[in-house]
Amino acid sequence: MTSWASENVTTKTATELAGDIKAGRFTAERAVRAMLTRINELDRSGPQLQSIITTNGQAMTVARAIDEAMQADPNLGGLLQGVPVLVKDNIETREMPTTAGSLALVDNNTGRDATIVARLRSAGALILGKTNLSEWANYRSQNGVAGWSGVGGLTRNPFDLNRSAGGSSSGSAVAVAAGFAPVALGTETSGSIVSPAAAMGLVGFKPTVG
């Protein structure tokens, strides 16, 4: 049995996990530790799903700070207090590079959050890392493969490693399906959320603009 199995954290929905953290049944630190362990076992090694481009080096520190704040005031926090969230790597995050999967942007540290990331943080979410994608959220050529990027390699379908994970928000869908986080952000112009969500048997939601 793997080390994360007994945690019973990685199979929970965001709502369930937020409720457990608020009620003191889990800590944010325990949730983050379990998910980082699972990423190391299944994304970096094992089947090497390659859904994650980078993890947040500050995640454990942030999780401990959240736990300490909630111990001092149990009523503290938003709807996602302490819940780990993954973000597609074409969405800016202040503490991690935003590469869009391209080697040209591996050092693209903007030092700021996209509006949607700032709103997640204000709701208490913990940004766990950045997910792989079809490079530039599109195909580089007519022979391009969904879910491949120069930075992250080919995102692999956890249900069948020989099948496509869809794209372009491949890493976000695979990461949720594999239990690396209960929720992840994607982007979509034409099918980039719904395609990988369908391939993973997940709900993919693209809100209307305006």
PLM segments and residue spans:
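Short, well-ordered alpha-helical
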Residues: 2-106, 136-138
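Short glycine/serine-rich loop/turn segments
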Residues: 80-210
